[in-house]
Curated annotation (Swiss-Prot):
Lineage: Eukaryota, Metazoa, Chordata, Craniata, Vertebrata
Residues carrying S-nitrosocysteine: 94
Protein name (Swiss-Prot/TrEMBL): Hemoglobin subunit beta
Modified residues (N-acetylvaline): 2
Domain Globin residue range list: 3-147
Biological-process GO terms, alphabetical: hydrogen peroxide catabolic process
Family that this chain belongs to: Belongs to the globin family.
Provenance organism: Tachyglossus aculeatus aculeatus
Tissues of expression: Red blood cells.
GO cellular component: blood microparticle; haptoglobin-hemoglobin complex; hemoglobin complex
């Protein structure tokens, strides 16, 4: 559960209304794979990840990034039940994929960077604080199966 105040919900939802999940999702996942290259081992089937340009231009990275970012939209609709919303994804990432749960935090932080880059004027310190709360809540929900 993420407790966002009314103004925090407004900040998050207003910005979310301008997010292009295809563009920003691909960028966020791509940046994760470039900045934290050891995370690439989970995406070996995606083809060429040999350089930053290859990662950022990879169609499979972009498509999966859009899918990942779409799940943040689900989070916004289910702030009171993030653990339930992400239960199946948590189980998949824990039991089948064996993803280090710290990678969820990393992705959340990369997403905040991407949002700041694209929405610099709207991404006020207050908006950043609200988004940090949201990505932390999503990260915690995704890591739930690990506990």
């Amino acid at each position: 559960m993420v407790h966002l105040s009314g103004s925090e919900k407004t900040a998050v939802t207003n910005l979310w209304g301008h997010v292009n999940v295809n563009e920003l999702g691909g960028e966020a996942l791509g940046r994760l794979l470039v900045v934290y290259p050891w995370t690439q081992r989970f995406f070996e089937s995606f083809g060429d990840l040999s350089s930053a340009d290859a990662v950022m231009g990879n169609a499979k990275v972009k498509a999966h990034g859009a899918k990942v970012l779409t799940s943040f939209g689900d989070a916004l609709k289910n702030l009171d039940n993030l653990k339930g919303t992400f239960a199946k994804l948590s189980e998949l990432h824990c039991d089948k994929l064996h993803v280090d749960p710290e990678n969820f935090n990393r992705l959340g932080n990369v997403l905040v960077v991407v949002l700041a880059r694209h929405f610099s004027k709207e991404f006020t310190p207050e908006a950043q604080a609200a988004w940090q709360k949201l990505v932390s809540g999503v990260s915690h929900a995704l890591a739930h199966k690990y506990h």
